[in-house]
From Swiss-Prot:
Enzyme Commission identifier(s): 3.1.-.-
Protein family: Belongs to the AB hydrolase superfamily. Lipase family.
Modified residues (N6-succinyllysine): K126, K184, K191, K260, K271
Organism: Homo sapiens (Human)
Protein name: Serine hydrolase BPHL
């Protein structure tokens, strides 16, 4: 690892492994199960799969939370489900196919998996009878949000993304390779995902994700969705943690430059999970932008 990444890369990898999914227990969800008194959980058939989602709030403004790699609504968005303004917003957090409780099917990563997730997300919200939605997308969920905003502009009201990238560099590819073997992750990081998925599925899916995200490096300019950025029409807020060990600042700058009229907000102490570590600050920022 040292020989491959070099000193800077190893430091970034260590920071990444310490900042991946924090330990949050996820209860096994059934049809219309309740999380406390205010968050409900259910599944709905969308594009041939049963997609799991959680919903809270009673506001007129629908907001969809899109999780990151191996993520789910509850593992990735606990403070948002609990504390976003329930009078102003109806908040939905989804588990993409193959993640969280949206299984079966097993997660796979064809060349168009981000586009598939974007279509699934939009079609889920339409199935739930929302006429228009705003998006909060973290990491892979931010990429999905960008694609959804570009491909379904009449349906997306506003968008907040963080920890996202529109292309893959050599540096990115090496960092992804460094997290392939989950047995090398810290126990604190690994155990919650083992509890959710079981070790075999967790380990296998992480390896498949690394291969899936690295495939973009073989495309011109490492393209994931950079060609779609000029098509985003909705107001967009890009949030970036200056200490993010996974997504360097230049990715946020690139998205900001190519999404017309977007705003860039920097959090000096923020890492990749800034919406969890600084949940109150992030929630206020998102609420102010969405209103």
């Amino acid at each position: 690892m040292v020989a491959v990444l070099g000193g800077r890369g190893v430091l970034r990898l260590r920071l990444l492994l310490s900042a991946l999914k924090p330990g949050i227990h996820v209860p096994r969800a059934g049809p219309a199960a309740a999380f406390g008194t205010s968050v409900t959980s259910a599944k709905v058939a969308v594009n041939g799969v049963q997609l799991h989602y959680q919903q809270t709030g009673e506001g007129d403004h629908a907001v969809l939370l899109l999780p990151g790699m191996l993520g789910s609504g509850e593992t990735d968005f606990g403070p948002q489900l609990k504390n976003l303004n329930k009078k102003l917003f109806t908040v939905v957090a989804w588990d993409p196919r193959g993640y969280g409780h949206s299984r079966p099917p097993d997660r796979d990563f064809p060349a168009d998996f981000f586009e598939r997730d974007a279509k699934d997300a939009v079609d889920l919200m339409k199935a739930l009878k929302f006429k228009k939605v705003s998006l909060l997308g973290w990491s892979d969920g931010g990429i999905t949000a960008l694609i959804a905003a570009a491909k379904y502009p009449s349906y997306i009201h506003k968008m907040v993304i963080w920890g996202a990238n529109a292309y893959v560099t050599d540096e990115d590819s090496m960092i992804y390779e460094g997290i392939r073997d989950v047995s090398k992750w810290s126990e604190r990081t690994r155990k919650p995902l083992e509890a959710l998925y079981g070790y075999d599925y967790f380990a296998r899916t992480c390896e498949k994700w690394v291969d899936g995200i690295r495939q973009f490096k073989h495309l011109p300019d490492g393209n994931i969705c950079r060609h779609l950025l000029p098509r985003v029409q909705c107001p967009a807020l890009i949030v970036h943690g200056e200490k993010d060990p996974l997504v360097p600042r230049f990715h946020a700058d690139f998205i900001h430059k190519h999404v017309k009229g977007s705003r860039l907000h920097l959090m000096p102490e923020g890492k990749h999970n800034l919406h969890l570590r600084f949940a109150d600050e992030f929630n206020k920022l998102a609420e102010d932008f969405l209103q």
